[in-house]
């Protein structure tokens, strides 16, 4: 139809309230209001957010497929690095690889960080050139069949130092501790605490500077997070990230991120790419 708003107006009961999501553009909402399409308009974002937080079987399959593509892409991304290449040059090649693998492109702007830049969790790729001994952090995600993937792995360009190994192992164990706790009924804040405790016990507590994770689906960051302040219970069908990190200013940073899908009795880890420390180049 040339006027889809008229069709929507015809389908809505003018004697009943109409719930609208917070993201409904004004160019759609205002014409409906002008036509008196409903008795009143109410914000219904909580209901929409709750529905999106609980993935049905088709959505779960889409999340698995997107994450499998992300795993395959990570194996390709690591092959791009060599001495002297810049973060921006690497980042510029990622979307083409995603498209070759069947994805529609990025689910968010990729983070590619070398050396001390990896100590900034939200670093934007720049002209920094890769040098021997640098850590190489990829925080990347693709969009496939409208659903988002998100994963982080941290490598070393050359032989890892003892400190790089220690930090990487601590982050890996924190990731494992959090994943082991994910099941229906577990509280998000307790999952965050499990990862944070591992990092604190290793003496790096002040250097884990962000929440443990976020929910994901049609958008890469959806309402609800895995943090110390979120005491709601985990429920089947929810999908969220587990991404502990240690960030040492002026030195390097390490983050290891996986997506988990909550099942009836535990969780399914959607990423299978190895988490152990590895070298690139």
Describe every region a protein language model picked out:
Residues 1-281:
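Active-site neighborhoods and metal-handling regions in enzymes and metal-associated proteins
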